[in-house]
């Protein structure tokens, strides 16, 4: 039977439940179990697609086109699996389904209520994933215990403990802060969060204490006394040098052994050698490479978390230390001299939408192109690379994307045909995996080592086919195209040290154990240029 591990959080949000969930799943996977993870989000949005990145962080796109919570990215990166959009359950989805069912007469005249109809819908969605054949399903319940919107999900989890014959474990994650004045750990907030959990009928089996530094045995004893959780089932996730070390420190404390004992499952000895080597490579590297990330949401780093992690994955395999420089494209518009002051080794032009900060991104693209600095553009970053090239190389000074200037005389970027008749925002973009053909002999071909790939997408606009010929005749290489429609998927320059931009999002396929080749190539080029060598991809000198 499938085991279910529910992860709850106390005291405040953003305490690290997502990493704890991914770590627990990884600990079980390291013992030979097949494991998947689910994120429950109690908000009423159907998905994360239309939410402000400053409120929600990155929208993580799944292979099947789901616009999901960024925690699904952590799950995929830790487990090296592909999750579907069904692995992100929101209140909006649940209530929409229940109300639709009531309208269609599914409930045969019953009075439709939170219990049992909403809770049954929640349980059905969790069990549908379990039926795929997993040994264990780890479910992170978003938000904080005590939030009104979380109550139906906690109630559904409580019911599942009754119904699943001992195959359910509850793990509670909560912080124990340190007062600066006394340098003392304070456990009272955690104690109260467990009291809130008990009020809804849930006694946690395991507690993970989040702290800035390792807790003392006295703290563990005090938490045990007031939460009714034995000391050997209390673990500490303290701040470490990389999130990929968290499963290692929790397993060293015995979490894997105790969890499998509670679930009464037979497992193998954990295999951590490859993971440990990569983590050590990540934290012990000394050669530094500076990568500038240029976009408009840089004040909240979580808005681009998959790109940051993809850089770290590639750096770990190359045994270098990435230094990430954040570049606010709006600030570049005010002061273009910021670009040379950064003295960077490589640029990534970040994805995004809208007019704000666009000219700053275009300035950064031009600076990288004219100064032979390695550049990778992603999604909007590719579209604006085309705009910059059309303006500066083709001489089409009014060239733009119709997303920003619908009246431009040279719409080198225009809305895709399939998007023109759509008048809703949510879930209507070109989303998820698409099959792509790579141009034989291109730089991209050498990087991938393949002529046919699949990558994830999230966009409405495309390179305007009316400008294909002009752009190509001016030296812009279309190195990848969609298989099913005439759509540019990647561009590159052969007279530049390293200049590649993609319509797709390579960051969503990067893993610590399997970094994405585009990020590895960017860092290789940046390192070679830093050492004064010819480009390993074009032969161009620095």
From Swiss-Prot:
Record field: catalytic activity: UTP + L-glutamine + ATP + H2O = CTP + L-glutamate + ADP + phosphate + 2 H(+); L-glutamine + H2O = L-glutamate + NH4(+); UTP + NH4(+) + ATP = CTP + ADP + phosphate + 2 H(+)
The EC number of this protein is 6.3.4.2
**PROSITE patterns attached to this UniProt entry:** GATASE_TYPE_1 (PS51273)
Query: Which residues are responsible for catalysis?
Result: 379, 505, 507
Sequence positions that bind CTP: 13, 147-149, 186-191, 222
Chain intervals for the UniProt region annotation (Amidoligase domain)? 1-265
The pathway is: Pyrimidine metabolism; CTP biosynthesis via de novo pathway; CTP from UDP: step 2/2
- The lineage's top-level taxon is Archaea
Q: Which residues form the Glutamine amidotransferase type-1 domain?
A: 297-532
**UniProt-recorded Gene Ontology molecular function terms:** ATP binding; CTP synthase activity; glutaminase activity; identical protein binding; metal ion binding
Q: Is Transmembrane helix tagged as a keyword?
A: no
Q: Which residues bind L-glutamine?
A: 54, 352, 380-383, 403, 460
> What biological-process GO terms show up in the record?
'de novo' CTP biosynthetic process; pyrimidine nucleobase biosynthetic process
- Does Hydrolase show up as a keyword for this record? no
Looking up InterPro entries in the UniProt record yields: Class_I_gatase-like (IPR029062), CTP_synthase (IPR004468), CTP_synthase_N (IPR017456), GATASE (IPR017926), GATase1_CTP_Synthase (IPR033828), P-loop_NTPase (IPR027417)
Residues engaged in binding ATP = 14-19, 71
Binding positions for UTP per the UniProt entry: 13, 186-191, 222
Q: Which residues bind Mg(2+)?
A: 71, 140
Instruction: Tell me the function of this protein.
Output: Catalyzes the ATP-dependent amination of UTP to CTP with either L-glutamine or ammonia as the source of nitrogen. Regulates intracellular CTP levels through interactions with the four ribonucleotide triphosphates.
- Other remarks on this protein: CTPSs have evolved a hybrid strategy for distinguishing between UTP and CTP. The overlapping regions of the product feedback inhibitory and substrate sites recognize a common feature in both compounds, the triphosphate moiety. To differentiate isosteric substrate and product pyrimidine rings, an additional pocket far from the expected kinase/ligase catalytic site, specifically recognizes the cytosine and ribose portions of the product inhibitor.
Q: Which family does it belong to?
A: Belongs to the CTP synthase family.
User: Assembly and interactions?
Assistant: Homotetramer.
What's this protein's name? CTP synthase
State the organism named in the record.
Caldivirga maquilingensis (strain ATCC 700844 / DSM 13496 / JCM 10307 / IC-167)
> What does the record give as the organism's lineage?
Archaea, Thermoproteota, Thermoprotei, Thermoproteales, Thermoproteaceae
The UniProt gene name for this protein comes to pyrG
């Amino acid at each position: 039977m499938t085991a279910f591990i529910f992860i709850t959080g106390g005291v405040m949000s953003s305490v690290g439940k997502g990493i704890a969930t991914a770590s627990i799943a990884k600990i079980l996977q390291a013992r030979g179990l097949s494991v998947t993870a689910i994120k429950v989000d109690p908000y009423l949005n159907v998905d994360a697609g239309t939410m402000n990145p400053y409120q929600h962080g990155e929208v993580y796109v799944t292979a099947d086109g789901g616009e999901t919570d960024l925690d699904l990215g952590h799950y995929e990166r830790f487990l090296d699996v592909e999750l579907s959009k069904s692995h992100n359950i929101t209140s909006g989805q649940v209530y929409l389904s229940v109300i639709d069912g009531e309208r269609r007469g599914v409930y045969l005249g019953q009075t439709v209520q939170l219990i049992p109809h909403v809770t049954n819908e929640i349980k059905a969605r969790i069990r549908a994933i379990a039926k795929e054949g997993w040994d264990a399903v780890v479910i992170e319940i978003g938000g904080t215990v005590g939030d009104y919107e979380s109550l139906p999900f906690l109630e559904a989890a409580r019911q599942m403990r009754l119904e699943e014959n001992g195959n359910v474990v509850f793990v509670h994650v909560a912080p124990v802060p340190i007062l600066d004045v006394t340098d003392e750990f304070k456990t009272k907030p955690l104690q109260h969060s467990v009291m809130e959990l008990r009020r809804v009928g849930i006694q946690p089996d395991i507690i993970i204490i989040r702290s800035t530094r390792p807790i003392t045995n006295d703290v563990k004893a005090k938490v045990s006394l007031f939460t009714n959780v034995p000391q050997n089932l209390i673990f500490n996730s303290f701040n470490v040098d990389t999130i990929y070390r968290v499963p290692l420190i929790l397993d060293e404390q015995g979490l894997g052994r105790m969890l499998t004992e509670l679930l009464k499952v037979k497992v193998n000895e954990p295999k951590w050698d490859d993971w440990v080597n990569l983590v050590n490579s990540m934290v012990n590297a000394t050669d530094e490479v500076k990568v500038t990330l240029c976009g408009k949401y840089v004040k909240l780093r979580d808005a681009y978390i998959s790109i940051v992690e993809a850089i770290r994955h590639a750096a770990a395999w190359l045994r270098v230390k990435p230094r990430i420089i954040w570049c606010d494209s709006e600030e570049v518009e005010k002061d273009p001299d910021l670009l040379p002051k950064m003295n960077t080794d490589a640029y990534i032009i970040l994805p995004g939408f809208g007019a704000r900060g666009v000219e700053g991104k275009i300035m950064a693209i031009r600076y990288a192109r004219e100064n032979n600095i390695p550049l990778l553009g992603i999604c909007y970053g590719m579209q604006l690379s085309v705009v910059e090239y059309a303006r500066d190389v083709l001489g089409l000074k009014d060239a733009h994307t119709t997303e920003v200037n619908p009246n431009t005389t040279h719409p080198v970027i225009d809305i895709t045909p399939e998007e023109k008749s759509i008048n809703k925002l949510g879930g209507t973009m070109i989303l998820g995996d698409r099959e792509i053909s790579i141009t034989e002999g291109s730089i991209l071909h050498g990087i991938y080592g393949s002529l046919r790939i699949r990558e994830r997408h999230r966009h409405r606009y495309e390179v305007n086919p009316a400008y294909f010929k002009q752009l190509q005749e001016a030296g812009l290489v279309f190195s990848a195209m969609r298989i099913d429609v005439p759509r540019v998927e990647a561009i590159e320059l052969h007279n530049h040290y390293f200049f590649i931009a993609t319509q797709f999002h390579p960051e969503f396929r990067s893993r610590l154990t399997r970094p994405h080749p585009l990020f590895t190539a960017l860092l290789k080029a940046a390192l070679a240029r830093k050492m004064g060598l010819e480009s390993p991809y074009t032969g161009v000198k620095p």
